[in-house]
């Protein structure tokens, strides 16, 4: 071939390569293909394990322990560091112990423990005999505790010798005996309504646990990563992640619970390179005074869910953490979204990403729909009876399609609660969808963004207000450490008026805070109907969240804004102070009992909101 022809071919090849690279960058084809391939490999791994009668995560852990031997496996404050061999031996000891108690495959054992190595030994030991733990929130007591134990259908309850746990067990001891539950103390182990239990099936957990490399690039092995867990392991995020680490050969570090003062000390002393967060944990870390320890750790990756978008860059800049892995997933396991963020701004704040292929694949599987704001039910056309699909870029409650009723295990022995999450005949006769209860949107680039938990959305002046959006704007103020936004009922007004409970920082007080500046910020960043009518200044940072570091709006919402009611639903809040923004006001001003009485009255002098 003539030189000119070769050049022509080379040019065409280069152009083709450049075009392919452009399309890949634009449509994210390689990323989507890799994600689909991972899912297929996980399914194949599970199918192979079923054929070999080894479809339990315990066998993955057993193989990891055989490979890693004396390498460090579990670190915990106040405990010796356990090797993989020691961890495996302790798990087997517990397996024999539970078998001797009469526990058999398919049964559950109640576990009421703080994070500790013993919890992991017990969990893995139960898996070794085909049983499983029923992990119970160690903050529960009284009726809620008995409810969870009864729901587990367990004959045994292993509990912590910590004084608060043991005292709560003793308080309900007679009631446990009435339901034939034997409480066994483990010595030396160092939002509304009663809880529902979402079972984590082997078919759901095994595929992800069997895959390497991990989702966010975590590295197994003696010179690999170590993940720090201070979030409760009885929650899905922490518990599943920690077990998956052990099944994958990734060592872990445990703290009994989150401690702001001990957090970075633990990361440094344990040599952790990763930690898992939930909810407001990152905000708490940022609220602490700057310290040399902010950069003395080895943490390179944090991952979890619920990290407010306005905190991503602040966290990375202050603590020198290069990677953030945000995900969205329901404990029920019907929908999972992932976003690996390394900076640069593209996709900042996203909880997941779908390229062109995944957007096509899941077009009818993950669907935003219109919700009736008054009833909270899916809106249906009076003519057809079907739901209204909303544009992805606008967003709405996400429904996840189920191929059959058996595709979701449902809540453990809670058929009524299970049925409330299922909806049929959504877009056509015979279809079946799962209600996530969460509103998300997806932009033109395929990034998914969390809008709100719909139960927390409120309607004001005919508009739906996103509590997350309002909270993010408040969180950007230099003197606000934490903001919890919700809607409150006000006499003589329809819907709910916005209220934000805030905690201050930088020595700011209600009297020194620049209320004019805050008012200007809110009015410039939010539509008028979304600007909170009321602001409640709390006494402390961190007092507005649940044990899982997620904002608990219910007590604050139920207490409302009547100053006389302060402390009736929120213990220790008697010294909180209310401020409000009446129509036409230039800034927030104190809200008094007299103001409440005027709002409640029928005179023409009643203030406008």
Curated annotation (Swiss-Prot):
Family: Belongs to the ATP-dependent AMP-binding enzyme family.
Keyword Ligase: yes
Reactions it catalyzes: isopenicillin N = penicillin N
Region (Disordered): 545-570
Protein EC: 5.1.1.17, 6.2.1.-
Entry protein name: Isopenicillin N epimerase component 1
Pfam families attached to this UniProt entry: AMP-binding, AMP-binding_C
GO CC aspect terms: cytoplasmic side of plasma membrane; lipid droplet; peroxisome
Keyword Repeat: no
InterPro entries the UniProt entry points to: AMP-bd_C, AMP-bd_C_sf, AMP-dep_synth/lig_dom, ANL_N_sf
């Amino acid at each position: 071939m003539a030189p000119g022809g070769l050049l022509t071919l080379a040019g065409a090849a280069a152009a083709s390569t450049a075009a392919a690279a452009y399309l890949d960058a634009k449509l994210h084809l390689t990323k989507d293909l890799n994600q689909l391939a991972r899912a297929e490999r996980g399914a194949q791994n599970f199918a192979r394990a079923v054929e070999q009668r080894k479809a339990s995560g315990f066998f993955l852990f057993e193989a990891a322990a055989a490979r890693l031997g004396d390498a460090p496996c579990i670190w915990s404050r106040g405990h010796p560091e356990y090797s993989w061999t020691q961890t495996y031996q302790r798990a087997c000891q517990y397996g024999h112990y539970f078998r001797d108690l009469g526990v058999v495959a398919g049964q559950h054992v109640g576990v009421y423990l703080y994070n500790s190595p013993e919890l992991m030994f017990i969990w893995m030991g139960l898996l070794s005999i085909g049983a499983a733990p029923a992990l119970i929130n160690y903050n529960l007591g009284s009726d809620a505790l008995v409810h969870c134990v009864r729901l587990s259908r367990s004959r045994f309850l292993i509990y912590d010798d910590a004084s608060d746990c043991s005292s709560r067990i003793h308080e309900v001891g007679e009631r446990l005996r009435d339901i034939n539950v034997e409480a066994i103390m483990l010595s030396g182990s160092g939002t509304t309504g009663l809880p529902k239990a979402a079972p984590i099936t082997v078919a759901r957990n095994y595929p992800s646990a069997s895959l390497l490399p991990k989702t966010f690039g975590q590295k197994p092995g003696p010179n690999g990563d170590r993940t720090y867990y201070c979030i409760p392991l009885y929650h899905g995020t922490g518990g599943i992640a920690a077990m998956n680490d052990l099944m994958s050969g990734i060592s872990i570090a445990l703290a009994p619970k989150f401690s702001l003062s001990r957090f970075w000390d633990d990361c440094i002393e344990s040599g952790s390179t990763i930690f898992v967060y939930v909810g407001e944990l990152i905000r708490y870390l940022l609220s602490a005074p700057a310290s040399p320890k902010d950069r003395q750790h080895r943490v390179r990756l944090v991952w979890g869910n619920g990290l407010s978008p306005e905190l991503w860059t602040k966290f990375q800049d202050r603590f020198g953490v290069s990677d953030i892995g945000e995900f969205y997933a329901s404990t029920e396991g019907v929908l999972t979204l992932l976003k690996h963020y390394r900076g640069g701004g593209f996709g900042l704040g996203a909880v997941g990403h779908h390229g062109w292929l995944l957007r096509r694949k899941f077009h009818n599987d993950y669907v935003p729909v219109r919700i009736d704001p008054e009833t909270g039910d899916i809106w249906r056309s009076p003519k057809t009876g079907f739901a209204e699909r909303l544009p992805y870029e606008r967003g709405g409650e996400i429904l996840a399609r189920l191929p059959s009723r058996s595709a979701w295990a449902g809540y453990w022995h809670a058929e009524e609660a299970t049925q409330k999450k299922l909806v049929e005949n959504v877009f056509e006769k015979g279809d079946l969808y799962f209600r996530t209860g969460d509103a998300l949107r997806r932009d033109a680039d395929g990034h998914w963004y969390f809008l709100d938990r719909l139960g927390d959305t409120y309607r004001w002046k005919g508009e739906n207000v996103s509590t997350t959006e309002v909270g993010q704007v408040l969180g950007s103020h230099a003197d606000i450490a934490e903001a919890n936004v919700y809607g409150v009922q006000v006499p003589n007004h329809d819907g709910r008026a916005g209220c934000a409970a805030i905690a201050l920082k930088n020595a700011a007080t209600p009297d020194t805070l620049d209320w004019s500046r805050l008012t200007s910020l809110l009015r410039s960043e939010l539509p008028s109907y979304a600007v909170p009518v009321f602001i409640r200044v709390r006494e402390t940072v961190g007092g507005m969240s649940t044990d899982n570091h997620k904002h608990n709006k219910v007590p604050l919402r139920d207490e409302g804004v009547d100053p006389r009611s302060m402390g009736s639903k929120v213990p220790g809040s008697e010294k909180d102070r209310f401020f409000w923004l009446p129509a036409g006001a230039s800034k927030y001003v104190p809200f008094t009992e007299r103001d409440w009485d005027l709002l409640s009255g029928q005179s023409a002098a009643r203030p406008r909101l």
